[in-house]
């Protein structure tokens, strides 16, 4: 995000992949909310099935709060798991790509409950047109 600021580039879409980048939507919507370069940027997250199981450090929320991110936006991370990272990313994104063949039901329910534009593509080849349609009609609209 800091590199984008230094380049003075305002991206139309920021697409993040997997649990490793799942805090970026939160930071973009909360930490960088007053940054003019990101005012019109849309965030899409790709989620994958069969992720790592287990819990994350419970101090994670305190570390995020250090960046002055409000507690109510972190409720899903109170007892953080890798699945909860995805949930937080979805809640702070403008669209979701279901890229895994098998997806946890709670992820699918969350996208429906919050009316998130969703593209289910799995790992098939030749989905360029589907992405283009998704970006232009569902995300940038």
Question: Across the structure, where does each feature detected by a protein language model lie?
Answer:
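Catalytic cores of nucleotide-sugar-dependent glycosyltransferases that transfer UDP/GDP/TDP-activated
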Residues: 1-141
């Amino acid at each position: 995000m800091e590199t984008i600021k230094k380049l003075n580039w305002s991206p139309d879409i920021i697409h993040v992949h997997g649990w490793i980048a799942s805090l970026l939507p939160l930071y973009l919507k909360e930490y960088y909310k007053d940054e003019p370069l990101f005012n019109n940027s849309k965030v899409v997250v790709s989620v994958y099935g069969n992720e790592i199981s287990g819990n994350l450090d419970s101090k994670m929320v305190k570390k995020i709060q250090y960046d002055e991110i409000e507690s109510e936006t972190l409720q899903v991370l109170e007892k953080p798991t890798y699945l909860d990272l995805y949930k937080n990313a979805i809640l702070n994104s403008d669209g979701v790509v279901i890229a895994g063949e098998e997806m946890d039901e709670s992820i699918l329910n969350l996208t429906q409950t919050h009316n998130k534009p969703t593209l289910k593509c799995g790992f098939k080849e030749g989905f360029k047109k589907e992405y283009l349609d998704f970006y232009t009609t569902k995300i940038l609209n």
